[in-house]
Amino acid sequence: MDNNERRDKGMVYISDEAVFEKQKRARRLTYKMNNMDTSDFEGIAEVARELFGKCGKNIMVNPPFHCDYGKNIEVGDNFFCNYNCVILDCNKVTIGDNCLFAPNVSIYAAGHPIHSACRNTGYEYAREIHIGNNVWIGGNVVICPGVTIGDNAVIGAGSIVTKDISAWTVVAGNPCKVIREITDDDIEFFFKNNRFDENAFMDMERIWRENSNNGKFSFRNKGKLPEIIKRVKERFCNG
């Protein structure tokens, strides 16, 4: 069994010449992407679709972007990746629909042994990383090997994620901890205690209503949504 096979089976392996040979495709494609006219959005997206193992519709990547293999990265629809993202995809990295990455997001499926005597032999490992649907990852976040992030989670800027993150939570810190749960009451606010203005909120309600069956918009409890929307509208009426 060679080291590429060991890596793909989740075993420890050594990055020898055969392993580095497998990385050359990604290096050529990322070099191409990172040296393109940055206003050529569709051209960059076309290279990303060639680079990634699976790719949904309507994606946008702002170069520079770096990865090890590319083929181990799977992204869903409406993926937005801001500047200077690094994905060490020595194992599979799956990213769901409607995910947003701020600048300098780092996703590390790769790792090394704790003990230096083991580490210095050259053996390393890789563990899958799974990111659910509708996840927003803030700037300078680091996601470590083996982590799963649940749907609709928000990861605060500068966080170091070493453990699984539950769905519908806001998390932040080093190490990353739960700050609070996200509820449907949050639809009233866009930043801290800043509320959406009436025009913006009514436009969002229209978009939700017109797209109620396409699965893009998630709510924790749709049954309570009319009550929340009514309360927000009453606030507009009352000034």
Model-identified regions with their sequence ranges:
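Terminal amphipathic alpha-helical/low-complexity segments used for targeting or macromolecular assembly
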Residues: M1-N58, C176-G239
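Flexible, glycine/small-residue-enriched loop-and-beta-strand segment within the central core
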Residues: T38, F65-V75, F80-T148, N174-P175, ...
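Arg/Lys-rich RNA-binding interfaces used to dock onto structured RNA substrates
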Residues: V47, P63-P64
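A generic "structured core" feature
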Residues: M60, H130-G132, W136, V154-G156, ...
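Beta-rich strand-turn-strand
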Residues: G139-D164
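Acidic, glycine-centered active-site loop in nucleotide-sugar glycosyltransferases
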Residues: I165-A167, A172-P175
